[in-house]
Amino acid sequence: MAKHISVKGVVQGVGFRPFVYGLATRLDLHGWVCNTSGGVEILVDGQSSSLEEFIQFLSLEKPPLAKIDSIQVDEAPCDSSSNFEIHESQAVEGAYQPISPDMAICPDCERELFDPKDKRYLYPFINCTHCGPRFTIIKDIPYDRPSTTMANFPMCDHCQAEYTDPLNRRFHAQPIACPECGPFVELRETHSQFPTSDPRISSIEIRTSAILKARRLLREGYIVAIKGLGGFHLACDASNPYTVAELRDRKGRFDKPFAVMAANITTIASVCELQKEEQNLLTSREKPIVLLTKKKQNGWQAYHVSELVAPNLDNIGVMLPYTPLHHLLLNQTDPILAREPVPPILVMTSGNFSEEPIATDNTDALQRLSPLADAFLLHNRDIHIRSDDSVVRVDKSNIMYLRRSRGYAPYPVPLPFEVKPTLAVGGELKNTFCLTRDHYAFLSHHIGDVENVETQESFEQGIAHLSHIFRVEPEIIVYDLHPNYFTTEYAKRSKLDIPHIGVQHHHAHIASCMADNGLDNRRVIGLSFDGTGYGTDGAIWGGEALLASYADFERFAHLEYLPLPGGDAATRSPWRIAAGYAYTLGIDFDDLPFLQNIDKQALRILRQQVEKKLNSPLTSSMGRLFDAVASFIGIRNEVTYEAQAAVEMEVLSKPFVSIAKPYPYVIEETKNGRMIRLRELLSAILQDVRASESVGMIGARFHRTIAEIAIDICRGARELTDLNEVALSGGVWQNQILLDHVRDGLRQDNFVAYFHQQVPSNDGGLALGQAVIANYARAEQSELISEHRRNGSK
């Protein structure tokens, strides 16, 4: 009997059919393989021993980009053919399958890229079944060239021969291209167009003219917009302080760190501390931005990298070239490219104005980015869906995702339980959305802060695209409780004939961590520390200890409620938070140095706001407490990006953490659970400020105190409930000092501590938690659903 085999997982666009063909041919089997909308279907016939080997080798020898979730084998009638064939793809109504993210250029393609004898020498769109664009060019499944943005480029005879040769690694590589038939680059200045490459020009010198010109402009201090895999970057010489300052001014990004791209790993090792795990991430096929520690002596200055790239920080986001085009821009050794030397480290930041989505379309980029860039390095391969660079950090040999996008999305998060087709829309900041079906949670690429029309449109386009690709017709829509979030409004105006479920922000964080770690529906102690989240009482939460499962939660403890004078304005002015806290707690602070440059009239107005409760919402936010302390001790009164004050305090605190002792603190029993009082803690901090204790030591003592409070709260919860598992989630846990001390302390106290493994702990992972909660809480939410329907029918 023959075998019919169904393979599910990421098995399209990764060279799986050519692999199956080669394996079957090697084992002298006959039959066929084809893509369907749901995966890969195989019929094989031959000797029984060979069939057994074939099934075994499907998993053991699969292509590097393939991820197999399941293999189903059934008996089938004998196949009458005498050879093995690749059949045309078949669309199956309602079927779907995960698709591969875009992947960095593979070693084989990189070698060919710089081989003068190769047809694709210095060709910026070289790729094969093991690398290149996937997610950003796919319009539909099954994954075939007509369903991608490469449909506009008919293959030449040479590429067609490779595409149809089962022994070639470009066999059925859908984005296959060469200089004769594929995309090409061109360089334009803001007001003129340079002679540039043409797809049918054989001269290497002419074909590379745009890249050579771009290298010269970068060396001379200009800012160049570069079209990449998932959108545009803005690039400039990282060693030129004038250019970096100009880029900051044009982009309106005054302090937030820029990422850089370095020519090679040796260059990175010269300027940053580099551990083995970090090097593995940098050179992985995903090639994310990796946060690395700056070398303290000689290294950071070796290439004269400007301090303006990442001011007041001890680390920097670094990545290696991940597309052929990036390699051509940064290569230091090729004889043709060497005619225009280029700095070995370039600033490589998102191609947008701050808070806007990155540009993807040539026409849009030329209009929108003209005030930012002096020149544009364009290409004519369309980007169907944008995808920002992913940002990660090594956390005790594991990956901490700060932003999960290119290289990782839309790989699904496997769930240990089945879920209904669900759309979870996430939060307002660092937005991702989540689609679920079966045992998968498809967390989207990074959308960003959905506070402007452009990002809102990107959000809606992303939902439409992924819903279509994964054939998800939601039966549940889930949103954050905050009534003024765009995502909440979007969810509430969508499809009134299905359940609409609101989920509390910090409950979603804890559920996200649980799902990320593959936990079933059981209660855990959840420490959800972040900057903001709408509470069930209408206050702004953020320093929360919950007793939570997927189905429900109970608030066990929280930070004391204190006012935010000016509301959102306070998040940009930590001095307002500090002063508001001190006024409310009756702490004398008029003599403190941080007030020296604060207008007295502004202080009087702030005091009136607090006393009269005018635009001063109450908060239990841990993030705002970090901001207040950073202001109290003189680090920063104003911020230009989220968590700036807290991050700078962490940097200054690191040298003192090992010797710092916690401040006194009080946890008070109240009728609504335990409350962490702040008067004693803040008074002790101000006493150290008056005693001229170093800023770093005060910051370190504060970090140690919060860690002790967190562990103390967990002990109290365990005594009452016998719960022993703790989930840590929320953006504050990206603070490495706090995470290390709490996680280690919990484990020493025999707790089981969980932190995120596959998705960010910040709001970039929020939608995952929303989705799983909605699936478990349907019965509990029936009253909310009925109310929504009643309101919707009016």
Show where each model-derived region lies.
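Internal gly/pro-rich beta-alpha loop/helix module
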Residues: 146-147, 162, 334-419, 619
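Active-site histidine-anchored catalytic micro-motif
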Residues: 514, 519-581, 588-591, 611, ...
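A contiguous, well-structured pocket-lining segment that forms one wall/lid of small-molecule binding clefts
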Residues: 175, 182-184, 427-457, 461-465, ...
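Conserved phosphate-binding/catalytic loops in two-lobed NTP-binding clefts
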Residues: 480, 497-509, 724-729, 736, ...
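Conserved phosphate-binding catalytic cores of ATP/NTP-utilizing and phosphoryl-transfer enzymes
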Residues: 269-275, 328-329, 358-363, 389-390, ...
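Intrinsically disordered, low-complexity, mixed-charge
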Residues: 1-175, 179, 184-186
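A phosphate-binding glycine/aspartate-rich beta-alpha loop in the early core of alpha/beta enzymes
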Residues: 75, 231-298
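Glycine-rich phosphate-binding/hydrolytic loop that grips phosphoryl groups
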Residues: 506-529, 533-535, 574-583, 703, ...
